[in-house]
Amino acid sequence: MIIRAPIRTKTKSFRGDQMDFKFPSNESLPRGTLEEYHLNNHHLLNDVFAAENGVSRDEDGNSQILSDYTSTSNTNTNSGYSSNGYYSFANISDNTTSSPRIVINQNETARLTSSDSNKSDFFASHDFPGNDSLHYSSSSVVKNQLHSMEAIPEGNITGSISTAFQTIPTADNVSYDIAPSSASSLLPRKSTSKSAILPSTQEAKPMTKLNMEKDIKTIELNNSVVPKPKKKLNRVPTIRRVESSRFSNSRYSSSVSSKSSSSRCSLKRSKAIRCKGGLLYYFTSLGIKIKKKLRKLRLVLRRRLFSYNVQKVPSATNSKTTKSKANINNKSKKRGTNLVNKNSNSTPRQKKSQRYVSNLQRSISSKSLVPVLAPQKKTKPLTVDTKFKANHPQSEDSKVGSNTPRSPLVSYTPSLRRTNSSIRRAASILTASATMTPANNKNSFISVPDNVSHAVTRNSSMYSRSRLVRSKPSTALNAIARQPSIVVENKVIPLSMNRYSIKEEDEYVIDTSSMRELSPVNSVCSSDYDRESSESYSNYADAMETTEVDNKDRVECNNEIQNVNANNEETSNEESYNLMKHYLSTVIAQRIMLRVQIARIQNNKSNVVYMNKSAETNSTIYEDLADSLLTEYEADGSSSQIFDGVSVRADEEEEEDEDDEDDEEEEEENDDEEDEEDEEDDEDDEEEEEKRKEGEGRNLAKEVDELAELSPMRKQSDLSITLRSPFAMLNSAYSNSIISLPTGVVKRSLTLPVGMKI
């Protein structure tokens, strides 16, 4: 069962804020025997508790049970009752329930009907006095089953109606108190006007004795039709607006008076609680939408009236497509006129927009472009080839600024707005190899002098086969004409034909062939390193850079290492061949032996005989198994013991295999003979069993002693595990289930089978 306990801070439905409100369940109800129908509506519960406990206005103990959220019209619960613990949306209107209307016939009762159910509630229709009000009462169908309804005593009594089938709750979170408008037309105009003027917080006055007597007389006349009510209301309930703490503005607080035409109106009123689907929510959301549209319209009008554009913008009647096309055309025309009029771009921002780099000569220096690690004393800076003109195939996009004189560095490719990380990945590096950017390439506009070409092309394929790839020095990003590229799924895909070599910052390709010990020429002391680095920037050696001395040392070292390796490989190959041969021969021999033993044990014919023999002759199966295991695994497994007598050991094992096969045949013959003898001696089995049990008790102690004597064969550090049946000492018949072997004796190999059936 799901029990939800919401926090309702803004409601005062049961004399105060209900912070600890819980929905009713079987646990919170009294233990009295009540029918399920009595638990059906909250007003019935009010009557029951008022009858049993007596009503006190300050008592709030029943507020957990007197709930507004259950009714028979509830479709969100399983059974329609309040005891299942689920939230029921009975009083929350979804704009599908119609307002109740009154069917009036003369000299008959006025019947309050609703279109969604066949239930009806009756009014008493008489000639009422001027100050009398309409009385609700329960129908005659439920007369014998239910208590007649009483007014619910609350702190703010606003004259709520309670009937057998329908309730109109009185809470501050209720948007309307609904009363049929035709009911008010039955009364004189004075009474309806007075009741309409009554404020929402006015409490119902107690009935006077005269009014009570008159009402009793008039009801007794029509007693055959209308049952007698217990209490009655003092005035006609009217449709009245109830303020909530949320919407307490003045525009929402206007009172709505009842009219005679409202019953025939097709408007669907919100029954109780303001919610998504009620009329109030609809109108508030409508107002919000209208406000947004008005703000947009105001902005559009201000743009139209106070725009400083030279050309007029098309009118607002045009569609969105024409607006977007006109804006694009205006921008392109302005850009073309600006480029034509201003031959010399004044501001650096305009230069930067046209990809003109102002600080190119200053930024491209010898330190930034020539590799730091290259041992060169004199370097020349890169020179920009101003005679070079970029030839672009004319397309539709490039015709925009075709009339403008082009600077030699400008390439009009559409710019991409990227993040810092994508710019860092896609940034061009000017230290690209000359082989990757030939002179006839249309994208290469930087000419490299011949002296620097070797240092610049150090990352080309002929130099970088066995080198560490390091992140190369580059100029500032704003001083470089960027490479045209596309960012797809956060990866930069270049569009140019290998214009520059792009290296990721974390791309370190380490070649193990370049790993070598530093020769004394290459080894750098800290003092030497500090002195040389202070003198010149590019004068120290690294594993990345190679010199002629390094090459000579490397060749000599490689030759020596190859000779030593060749000799070592020959000896190691012979040793490994011999070792594997010995190992495989021993393993194969042990496997063959173990399989023969397992086949002997698993034989069905010999199995029965082995069991009988084990009882007679001190469990020979276990002795055979232990002997075979001990003889085969007696060696410690050290390489000296294995490899010393390999040939002798293999010959012995082959002979043992042949002997085992012969033993199997002999044992099978013996088994057949023993089976015949057992059939003849069935009568003497009982006497033999008694003798057997006596002998087994003695043999048990002998077996344990014999097997315990095996442990000194191994080292004392080995553990010995004894597997013993719990019935061994109690019942000597199960003494053949004892296995006791030291762990040092039984050796296990990874290549041998582990599981055995015994």
From Swiss-Prot:
UniProt KW Phosphoprotein keyword: yes
Location (main, coarse): other
Subcellular location(s) per record: Bud neck
GO CC, one annotated term: cellular bud neck
Biased composition (Low complexity): 315-330
Ranges of biased composition (kind: Basic and acidic residues): 690-705
Keyword S-adenosyl-L-methionine: no
Compositional bias segments (type: Acidic residues): 651-689
Biased composition (Polar residues): 338-348, 355-368, 400-414
Chain positions found as Phosphoserine: 25
Keywords (A to Z) from UniProt: Phosphoprotein
Spans annotated as Disordered: 55-77, 314-414, 636-708
Disulfide bonding pattern of the chain: none
Family affiliation: Belongs to the AIM44 family.
Name of the molecule in the record: Altered inheritance of mitochondria protein 44
Organism: Saccharomyces cerevisiae (strain YJM789) (Baker's yeast)
Lineage: Eukaryota, Fungi, Dikarya, Ascomycota, Saccharomycotina
Gene: AIM44
